[in-house]
Amino acid sequence: MITNFVRADGYEEKELLAAMRSRAKEANALIARTAQTVMDDVRARGMEAVREYSLQFDKAEPREIKKSTLEGAAKRIAPELRYALEQSAKNIVDYQSRLLGESHVWDSPVEGGRVGQIVRALGCVGVYVPGGTAAYPSSVLMNVIPAKVAGVGEVVMVTPPTENLNDAVLAAAWIAGVDRCIAVGGMQAVAALTYGADFIPRVDKLVGPGNAYVAAA
């Protein structure tokens, strides 16, 4: 992250900074309103709205990505890249396994009472993986594997439906053990995973990086 420091000694500089802050607030408010509109629309119209937004923003319809496609990507990538992904996956599994919590229940001093905690995995988790020019296979590993180690019932990965999906990202999904992979992105992907839409399931939790619109959604 690059930070630029601006020294404002005079009236004009301070006015400029105030204007910049005002524009930033306006931009953030617009992003939030846009995201809320998409969320509400998908909640009301389901897959019909998801398809419309996907065609509008990504020029492609949402679709399921077969596991054979993920496996094929893992076979196509350079051997040294696959080795790096597999070693990273093993390290993450080892680390996350050591962090697992345990359930503990015991009798309390109060007659008939019991206290403790029950550790239970979520039923379904969604993992958002950005598309475009950037590829984040490490993000796939870091988000999918902890869920798998924790015992989450189903891990669903979504990524924008670009014409040529990134092989490194798909290979990472295969290595990490993603249960389902769906080509859908943007605010509509977040909305679909939040409320459920046709073949896109409703999830208990959604993780992963995204742009300002995805984050707002």
Indicate residue ranges for each PLM-predicted region.
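Short alpha-helical
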Residues: 48, 163-164, 188, 212
